[in-house]
């Protein structure tokens, strides 16, 4: 399955979650349900709170970067439940993409 096909599935799930639960819940609620739907309904490999290290001159450095969800090692999903996205949120996903080698990332704000 391509990155774009995975992204369409994720957006559809996010829409359904938001339609049923609405805004205002903690991010972890949306994350848990998203993971559940991807695994149970679509039988996809999902890693939750995936650590993303920095590799510098063959030294692995753990800086605390964690992607909310990685699907099939092809798509990073960063979920938010905040008033509005700030530039730092886009930078966060770009950092994760560059460090992980994953090609596509999505930010979804449930608020």
Predicted segments with their positions:
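Conserved beta3 VAIK motif of the Hanks protein kinase fold
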Residues: 77
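Interdomain/boundary linker segments immediately adjacent to catalytic/signaling cores
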Residues: 1-21
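Nucleic-acid nuclease catalytic cores
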Residues: 80-111
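Nucleic-acid endonuclease domains
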Residues: 2, 25, 59-60, 93, ...
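Active-site metal-binding core of divalent-cation-utilizing nuclease and nuclease-like domains
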Residues: 23-74, 82
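Active-site catalytic microenvironments for nucleophilic, acid-base chemistry
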Residues: 17, 37-40, 99
